[in-house]
A protein has these predicted regions:
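Glycine- and charge-enriched low-complexity intrinsically disordered segments
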Residues: 165, 169-201
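Alpha-helix initiation/capping motif
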Residues: 1, 52, 213-216
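Autoinhibitory propeptides
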Residues: 1-13
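Serine endopeptidase catalytic core focused on the charge-relay Asp
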Residues: 17-163, 188-189, 201, 227
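C-terminal subregion of chymotrypsin/trypsin-like serine protease catalytic domains
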Residues: 187-229
Length: 229
């Protein structure tokens, strides 16, 4: 089921959606990680938005954030898949966009110019990665480990925890990640151009060190990825 992932710039009012945009999903402020086109059935093409899955429920509505508040007059779409449960792999959700919502070409705002996204990438130990979030902007990360099990709050109240499997982790070297960055893209700046690695989940700390946890693209199941050169 091939899907084209794209990451980009802020939302243009009413019609166009990019990755890397500030969005409200249910009661959570997130960053969109990528837009995707499900082209498995040419007679029923679905436009999707990929973001984080924590604190999200099926059928939650998604709106763009304008300034500091959601624009509830502009419905982008509805959550149709959530992956965030104890013992499961990855932290993400898929939002099916309305038929009137347009998606963009294969570009990403980093953060002041549109740059092509040339494919996906599975990082090696020590690789320099970058995350983008609408709250914390760009942060530089040193990749450390894949296939991690991460303990996270079961709900926004934080009264209990669950374990999410199959996550990646990297040490934040420069910049920050904060509330509102969840779901945003993590990428690798290769000699060929930017390559998508995953989607922001959260942070954890050890002493003075802060680490970013993120869902690798390979954990977004049920879809193939078709990058546009």
């Amino acid at each position: 089921m091939p899907v084209r992932f794209e990451i980009g710039a802020p939302i243009v009012p009413n019609t166009i959606v990019y990755g890397g945009s500030a969005i409200r999903v249910g009661s959570a402020n997130f960053t969109s990680g990528a837009v995707a086109t499900n082209v498995a059935d040419s007679s029923n093409v679905k436009k999707l938005l990929v973001t984080a899955g924590h604190y999200v429920s099926l059928k939650d509505k998604c709106y763009p954030i304008k300034g500091t508040r959601p624009d509830t007059d502009t419905l982008l779409g509805t959550v149709t898949k959530v992956q965030y449960a104890d013992g499961k792999y990855g932290d993400y959700s898929l939002i099916t966009l309305g038929s009137d919502i347009e998606i963009t070409t294969n570009t990403y705002e980093r953060p002041y110019e549109l740059t092509p996204l040339v494919g996906g990438y599975y990082p090696k130990d020590g690789d320099t990665l970058y995350k983008f979030g609408r709250a914390g902007n760009v942060a530089k990360i040193t990749f450390q480990e894949a296939n991690m099990s991460v303990v996270m709050p079961a709900s926004s109240s934080g009264s209990s925890t669950i374990t999410i499997k199959g996550m990646m982790i990297g040490k934040i070297e420069d910049g920050i990640s904060t509330g509102g960055d969840s779901g945003g893209p993590v990428y690798y700046n290769s000699s060929e151009g930017l390559k998508l690695v995953g989607f922001v989940s959260g942070t954890t700390s050890t002493g003075t060190n802060v680490y970013l946890t993120f869902t690798p693209v390979s954990r977004v199941t049920g879809c193939g990825i078709n990058y546009v050169d």
